[in-house]
Amino acid sequence: PFAADGSLDESAWRALLRLYAEHRVHGVLVNGTTGEWFSQTPEERRRVAEIAVAELSGRVPVVIGCGAFTAAECVRYGEHARSIGADGILTTPPPYAHPSQEEIYAFYRTLAEAVDLPLMVYNWPRGTAVDITVDTLVRLAGLDTVVAVKDSSGDELKVADTCAALAGRVQVFGRFIHRRGMAVMAEFGGAGNIDGGGLGAPFAVPFYEAFWAGDMDLAREWSARYERLVALLVNGDYSSRFASPTSQLKAAMRLLGQPGGHVRPPLLPLEDPSVLLRLSAALDEAGLHPCSTSNGNR
């Protein structure tokens, strides 16, 4: 989280990590898309990672986002993650560069060969303007350190195809908390969700625990609650209904009394009182009850 003046808010970050642990999440991803890695300095990114590992070590697995414009930069962040005891690393293909599928494979191969940590491939077409094909994901699964794929394409059919192609080889994280997702997991073993900000954790954690325990009726109950939250806040392409995704998320967290902090430029804060009231009403309808409906500055 950032303070209102744009500085890194270390105390809020520690409090947020403790909140995630209280929610019994199964892992924490640091410096991903929601973590605004693009507006942090290298020193800040390393500090954020160090705090997360120190706060959660031994309790919750910590994966560090290494997103950057070059493989060399990713390697440096990956080496730092290994040195502080992180459990794994994640990155998208380089943004803006529009690499080919062969270039995507070469990029991940460089990272996998250089950093001795479990590696998660992050497919995020909306943020990178490239979509990693299933064939390329199959090739990447052959790299020794690649253990998982985070598919944020928003394409449910492709996620199902990815799960089928990678079953028994690497884990696949996508959007599975719905009836179709349950069917995909039952058939191919999708591993879970990685949600920005953890707003859905009160519904997502018990959903997966019920599913893994074989209690499908209870899983469907939690799924319905989670789906309601998503429908109220998120569009099918992972854009958000009330503001840009991270601005909306942080405003929602503040409304709920959570230490979400503020965004940094180029993102703008969600401050319009009428929009905040609508966001607060959506949270309340989803079963997450705001502490305040007057503003998002708590």
Q: Each PLM stretch: what is its role?
A:
Residues P1-D131, L268:
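Active-site beta->alpha loop and helix N-cap motifs at the rims of alpha/beta catalytic domains
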Residues W13, R45, A49, C74, ...:
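A general structural signal for well-ordered alpha-helical segments in protein cores
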Residues A15, R76, A106-F107, D135-T136, ...:
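Short Gly/charged-rich anion-binding patches and loops
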